[in-house]
């Protein structure tokens, strides 16, 4: 009969095994979110530019990334980047580059939808004031679009945090890896995986509640 014993879980286990992985997962999530939004914004602007030389490459990149499983992209970057630059870069840096490149495709779609949600009248008003395309986007469109996109950005960030567990494929020490090592060392793999699931649930559920609160505030502002 299966028996579960969670008494082994203590502060020492957390500091020795879990904390390091948690910090890396959070760091990877934050960097990938910021980097993904920056790159994704450029991709979205390229797709909305109307210039074939910009639209086609950006569309190809976004569609390709969105059509390939993340774990495959993680493995590709980990194996191919060292070959291209002639030296190893390590699992942590490889994971960071991969997540920025991968998430940029998803954030670009969010940004594109956000820009398109801004009333055309706002754009025409900017043009009537003599603004260039760049000024119109920077001063009129993007500020309104980003306010509308904040809840969706946060939702995608929650998904991103969950996806960081896939870096186990290249040996990076993330939150799940910390629980896995603790389970092996303490001889309690089942219990540690249960605790890992509970930890992910608590973090993601808390963030989802924050998203709902922000959505309500954005709706009130509108």
Descriptions of predicted regions:
Residues 1-222:
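Transmembrane alpha-helices and adjacent helix-loop boundaries
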